[in-house]
């Protein structure tokens, strides 16, 4: 990998995103609006908002980054941009790292907005450090970016990219512990939830919600989410295609 080529790719993607106001709105505003809506849904029960809102603070960025990244990457391939780039002395690793760096920068802004709004405007009450909450939200957004880059290799159209959401995101959403504690699930489902990265994203948020200090479980959860993001990025580089058949 070449750092200069990676940085150039990231800068190009960011320039394109600057002119795509709809994608920017989806990435930055949708998580904020969803958290605000959730706060007023549980207006009479702030404890419920605290428990669910902390988890969704990580889930919403993951979902939005997954959608935008998968569609944006596929659009580049169908338009022939990836084919032209890969015809140049630019490796697949440089390309994927550049995309990850660009969308990762957006993920930082997204996580700052969502976390700041939840804590200081919506009254989300967490026992632990706000910085740890921000860290998990950022890792979740980066995981969504990695998953989006990966699945874009298997889609032939933007519609197919969206269709991957029920296959990749919805099972994790159901089994992550948001709706029921994972240790109360049927053993097969609990075992399946143990290998899904979103489960550890929710667990990490729960650790911040209930513990004043950084715990060993929090470190484990954060490391697993980060490792999953790196693994999926590596798979994305391995499966990247020049063009859509």
Residue ranges and their predicted role:
Residues 37-45, 155-195, 199:
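Transmembrane helix segments
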Residues 115, 200-210:
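Transmembrane alpha-helical segments of integral membrane proteins
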Residues 56-63, 104, 138-142, 167-175, ...:
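Hydrophobic transmembrane alpha-helices
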Residues 132-155, 173-176, 227-234:
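Hydrophobic alpha-helical transmembrane segments of polytopic membrane proteins
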Residues 2-83, 92-112, 122-137, 160-163, ...:
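Transmembrane helix-boundary elements of multi-pass transport/secretion proteins
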């Amino acid at each position: 990998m070449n750092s200069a080529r990676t940085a150039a790719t990231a800068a190009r993607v960011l320039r394109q995103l600057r002119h795509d106001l709809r994608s920017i709105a989806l990435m930055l505003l949708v998580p904020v609006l969803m958290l605000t809506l959730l706060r007023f849904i549980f207006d009479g029960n702030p404890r419920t908002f605290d428990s669910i809102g902390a988890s969704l603070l990580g889930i919403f960025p993951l979902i939005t980054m997954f959608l935008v990244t998968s569609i944006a990457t596929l659009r580049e391939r169908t338009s022939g941009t990836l084919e032209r780039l890969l015809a140049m002395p630019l490796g697949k690793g440089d390309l994927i790292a550049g995309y990850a760096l660009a969308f990762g920068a957006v993920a930082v802004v997204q996580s700052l907005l969502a976390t700041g709004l939840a804590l200081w405007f919506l009254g989300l009450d967490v026992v632990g450090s706000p910085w740890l909450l921000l860290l998990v939200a950022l890792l979740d957004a980066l995981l969504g970016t990695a998953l989006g880059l990966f699945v874009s290799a298997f889609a032939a159209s933007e519609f197919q990219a969206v269709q991957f959401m029920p296959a990749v995101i919805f099972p994790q959403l159901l089994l992550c512990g948001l709706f029921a504690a994972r240790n109360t699930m049927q053993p097969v489902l609990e075992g399946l939830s143990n290998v899904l990265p979103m489960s550890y994203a929710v667990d990490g948020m729960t650790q911040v919600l209930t513990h004043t200090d950084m715990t060993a479980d929090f470190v484990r959860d954060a490391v697993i989410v980060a490792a999953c993001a790196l693994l999926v990025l590596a798979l994305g580089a391995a499966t990247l295609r020049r063009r859509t058949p």
